[in-house]
């Protein structure tokens, strides 16, 4: 039987303003006596009573008691009397009655002992739940007041289908507003995106001659500017997309090919989307290294202009940089910072996203270069942003988040960073100002989000870090041996 483990956090109690806080030193002393001799006492008593401890298993109970001095000690003495080994204890203010607190006890015992314990607890406490999952408070009740966000990658299906404006809902000033053929084509792309679910291959599209021609014009004209206007990371990946994904003037690349390429390069994938998503839903995708991507092509009457993101914007603007590991991490961290954040904070993050990943500039070899997708997919604004006419400011999330985002005209200001790494570090510092009662961790093995708000959840992450550090140390030792250091 393992020694009992007690977790009392003075910060935890103080945060809730419980009167029980004043009793913690006294009760802690008593409880210390309970737990110090617990393993030995349990073993000896089990031997005398002839109970079989080999059938012990882990279980849990949540009970509610009045917020008064001595109440917790009286309840926990019952665990000792029934030889129930306490592994972990947490507490919080009761959501049912403000005058009570709820106690979560993770314990180890036999079925008989547990049933006897519950019968005794019922006389002193109110049983809330028995044998709950390990995450009963952190994943369910503790997140009741937090805006919903996907906890696993498959839940992005829910985000992707909450489209604010569908591709068929064109404004009167849209080039394709009066083109019924174009509108029907857009409806087809909506149906494809709305029917897609996580884990499926992205449906391949047979683009029309008109759509391929429009793509070709955009591809050809932008390709002339990239050598002098795009950042080096973009220029490094663009030829690879030509080689592996069919980036050519006479061919519109397929999202499935692009997604597989990105997965190998940076861990990102793309999935089709029917239209505009809310900032919260779009950023949630980035947290999982998933980029929501349109498949429709802009109207052919004006190939060099589009009032909305289309596949030319996605494939030529975003994809080449999503293949860069550092840029991919920068994008993901913005997404992670948005999970569970308030509407106000999400809007600030979305604005920072807009002026970096969409319209960001960086310095390379003493020259301004574009890395924002909105610039790299717009001939006119790409030229303007790197000209003397543009207003360029240093990127600072605290001030950038207040800048107005313009959709139909050039931006009033553009923001420059020395590197992706600098922009990422500034965003990390900015993310610390976001009010959120927990931190999040992306588990790449299960492709899920873990909530970090107690010692147990943090310990799991630390174990992963230790494993990574051991690998690094082993590699360094072998290098030193090889170099004779």
From Swiss-Prot:
CDD domains: ACT_TPH (cd04929), eu_TrpOH (cd03346). It holds the Pfam family ACT. GO terms for biological process: aromatic amino acid metabolic process; cellular response to lithium ion; circadian rhythm; response to activity; response to calcium ion; response to estrogen; response to glucocorticoid; response to nutrient levels. Residues 43-55 have a biased composition (Basic and acidic residues). Keywords: Iron, Metal-binding, Monooxygenase, Oxidoreductase, Phosphoprotein, Serotonin biosynthesis. GO terms for cellular component: neuron projection. The keyword Phosphoprotein applies. The modification Phosphoserine is found at residue 19. Residues 60-135 form the ACT domain. Interacts with DNAJC12. Belongs to the biopterin-dependent aromatic amino acid hydroxylase family. This is Tryptophan 5-hydroxylase 2. It comes from Rattus norvegicus.
């Amino acid at each position: 039987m393992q020694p009992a483990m007690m977790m009392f956090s003075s910060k935890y109690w103080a945060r809730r303003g419980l009167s029980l806080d004043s009793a913690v030193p006294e009760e802690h002393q008593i409880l210390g006596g309970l737990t110090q001799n617990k393993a030995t006492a349990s073993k000896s008593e089990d031997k005398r009573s002839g109970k079989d401890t080999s059938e012990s298993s882990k279980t849990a109970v949540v009970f509610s008691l009045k917020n008064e001095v001595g109440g917790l000690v009286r309840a926990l003495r019952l665990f000792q009397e029934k030889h129930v080994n306490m592994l972990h204890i947490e507490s919080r203010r009761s959501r049912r009655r403000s005058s009570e607190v709820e106690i979560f006890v993770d314990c180890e015992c036999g079925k008989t002992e547990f049933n006897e314990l519950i019968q005794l607890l019922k006389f002193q406490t109110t049983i809330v739940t028995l044998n709950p999952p390990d995450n009963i408070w952190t994943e369910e009740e503790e997140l009741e007041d937090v805006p919903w966000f996907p906890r696993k990658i498959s839940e992005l299906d829910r985000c992707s289908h909450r489209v604010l404006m569908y591709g068929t809902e064109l404004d009167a000033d849209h080039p394709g507003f009066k083109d019924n053929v174009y509108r029907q084509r857009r409806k087809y792309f909506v149906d494809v995106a709305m029917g897609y679910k996580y884990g499926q291959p992205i449906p391949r599209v047979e683009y029309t001659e008109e759509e391929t021609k429009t793509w070709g014009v955009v591809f050809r004209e932008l390709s002339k500017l990239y050598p002098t206007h795009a950042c080096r990371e973009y220029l490094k990946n663009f030829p690879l997309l030509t080689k592996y994904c069919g980036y050519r003037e006479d061919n519109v690349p397929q999202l499935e090919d692009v997604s597989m390429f990105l997965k190998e390069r940076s861990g990102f994938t793309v999935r089709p989307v029917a239209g505009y998503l809310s900032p919260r839903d779009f950023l949630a995708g980035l947290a999982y290294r998933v980029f929501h991507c349109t498949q429709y092509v802009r109207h052919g009457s004006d190939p060099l202009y589009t009032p909305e993101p289309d596949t030319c914007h996605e494939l030529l603007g975003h994809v080449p940089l999503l293949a860069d590991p550092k840029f991919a991490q920068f994008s993901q961290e913005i997404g992670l910072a948005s999970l569970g954040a308030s509407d106000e904070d999400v809007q600030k993050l979305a604005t920072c996203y807009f002026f970096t990943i969409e319209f960001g500039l960086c310095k390379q070899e003493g020259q301004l270069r574009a890395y924002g997708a909105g610039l790299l997919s717009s001939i006119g604004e790409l030229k303007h942003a790197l000209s003397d006419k543009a207003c360029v400011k240093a990127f600072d999330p605290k001030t950038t988040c207040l800048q107005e985002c313009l959709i139909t005209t050039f931006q009033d200001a553009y923001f420059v960073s020395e590197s992706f790494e600098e922009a990422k570090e500034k965003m990390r510092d900015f993310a610390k100002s976001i009010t959120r009662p927990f931190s999040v961790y992306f588990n790449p093995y299960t492709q899920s989000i873990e909530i970090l708000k107690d010692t147990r959840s943090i310990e799991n992450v630390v174990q992963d870090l230790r494993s990574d550090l051991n690998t690094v140390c082993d590699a360094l030792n072998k290098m030193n041996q090889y170099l004779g250091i």
